[in-house]
């Protein structure tokens, strides 16, 4: 039986509005999820201009309401969270363990989403800013711990991206020195990943003093207030070196500012690793001398997430009191177009860490 639900749908030209959406029954390998919370991410803002009408949202948690044939790992009424980098499990990347780089990208066919406004596609195969989402089974991870839906929802992008960039991609070791540039939700997740890895020094860098207060609460050992006029954060890099006595072993760029894409390279010591976490995609000039002396620069996608290993691990860390998620949700807004406008405004202003839409 088809489900009618309300969704926030973009027009592909920068606008979005509430609309009614009809979802078909789950087919083989599909799950119908009632959305209880949807995180708000910078990528959601970017997606408004992608030239097609989208059911917005790619961070979500809720309750499985119906499952299709062949779905065995979740059942109706299970609490679940959604994963946007959906692995097929069979392509060469998935077989190598690089599931976030899946080449097949399982999707529910777009004709299963019917809207009076015309053809729509679920963002990243999910479309979590809606009352319900119809998704491939590989997108669904069961929640087996006691956690608010809002806290679970943010695991599915920002938290996993930051934490995984530290633990999976960089493989930060105990005793290392780490710099995190930008202390929004992703940067705070890098801080938590570094704390989990038992880094000796975790230096948080931001131009917003309020975010440095958050970074300290999340595990940063040092906080450095940068100047907005510090081009390339070169002065901040010198301050980092003064704190450590040398460059850092690792530096993570979480600002989403194109001009700062190369900034982590200026922070690391010879042989150090700079990690691009925020997903800067613009063409930017880079001083190639920053790569000298075995410095490396990596750009991992989604913290190299293996959803059925990593997301349960993060849930277990939360349940053990070792991962702050409730504290990261600094504001909630109604799951509606007006609520999303307010959430985007809060995000642009730099208020708090993570905004979440709730029904």
Where are these regions (language model features)?
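C-terminal hydrophobic helical "lid"/dimerization subdomain
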Residues: 1-3, 262-265, 308-359
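NAD(P)H dinucleotide-binding glycine-rich loop of Rossmann-like/cofactor-binding domains
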Residues: 20, 88-181
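Glycine-rich beta-strand-centered segment in the early N-terminal region that forms part
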Residues: 22-38, 48-95, 100, 142-147
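Residue-level marker of beta-strand positions
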Residues: 59-61, 78-79, 93, 132, ...
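Short, well-ordered loop/turn sites that connect or cap secondary structure elements
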Residues: 74-75, 172, 268
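Mid-domain Rossmann-like dinucleotide-binding core that forms the NAD(H)/NADP(H) cofactor-binding site
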Residues: 80, 138-139, 144-229
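Short amphipathic alpha-helix with an adjacent loop that forms part of the alpha/beta core around
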Residues: 229-245
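Glycine-rich phosphate-binding loop and adjacent beta-alpha segment
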Residues: 258-323, 359
